[in-house]
């Protein structure tokens, strides 16, 4: 990739949880989610299963759907980009840090446009180690960083107090709003993550359709093949429910 003619690496970051849609005044769905702690692929399946095995949590999580209209708008933007743009598709947002360092070359600054339910500039957790919730801070320490966060009203309201890096930055609610304000933005690299610890498994079908379209569009693409498979949570939910039923029976017998 050419790096000598410019000083800034333009990055388009797409976290699939950006497309989560639910009533922004309904706290039930998020309260029923896992805590978002970084997990390996597969481990997060068990975590989700533990929530979905509970009738109340399962009902609340089911309220979350995919914003298909916004997903299509993002796809239209991707269709306008060069087919040779490097693309990485993976499970966790933490991998964007390494992807950027691989492509930064001699450039000394980074501009990240992050489509995300979360701003990912959190300081808590991880014992200071890189994770899916603090990678923005790592980039801010290592490079001159220009950061734009594109998020829905649900994401904006759920974030609470905003981090310093967003001070003075415009707010964008959609890719269309961002494009209108930044018509010349062209990404040098594109990062996509499924965010297994945040996106409910029932949204996998739309992600797979989107990811396979991306794979068919771009030539320089790589990633974790596990995120190109639908998560099979049902068997774990059944196991947990059966274990809970067994424990309840044993407790009932011992209490007599």
Question: Can you describe what each PLM-predicted range is?
Answer:
Residues 2-256:
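Conserved alpha-helical scaffold segments that buttress catalytic/binding sites
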């Amino acid at each position: 990739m050419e790096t000598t003619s410019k000083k800034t690496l333009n990055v388009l970051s797409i976290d699939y949880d950006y497309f989560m849609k639910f009533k922004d005044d309904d706290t039930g769905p998020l309260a029923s989610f896992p805590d978002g702690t970084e997990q390996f692929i597969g481990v997060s399946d068990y975590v989700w299963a533990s929530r979905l095995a509970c009738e109340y949590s399962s009902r609340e999580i089911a309220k979350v759907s995919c914003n298909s209209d916004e997903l299509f708008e993002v796809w239209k933007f991707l269709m306008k980009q060069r087919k040779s743009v490097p693309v990485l598709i993976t499970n966790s947002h933490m991998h964007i840090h390494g992807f950027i360092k691989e492509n930064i070359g001699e450039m000394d600054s980074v501009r990240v446009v992050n489509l995300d339910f979360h701003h990912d500039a959190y300081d808590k957790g991880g014992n200071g180690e890189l994770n899916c919730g603090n990678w923005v801070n790592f980039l801010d320490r290592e490079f001159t960083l220009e950061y734009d966060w594109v998020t829905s009203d649900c994401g904006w309201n759920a974030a609470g107090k905003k981090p310093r890096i967003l001070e003075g930055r415009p707010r964008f609610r959609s890719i269309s709003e961002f494009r209108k304000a930044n018509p010349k933005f062209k990404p040098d690299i594109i990062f996509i993550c499924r965010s297994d610890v945040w996106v409910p498994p029932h949204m996998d079908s739309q992600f797979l359709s989107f990811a396979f379209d991306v794979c068919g569009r771009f030539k320089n693409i790589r990633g974790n093949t596990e995120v190109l498979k639908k998560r099979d949570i049902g068997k774990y939910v059944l196991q947990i429910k059966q274990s809970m039923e067994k424990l309840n029976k044993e407790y009932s017998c011992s209490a007599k």
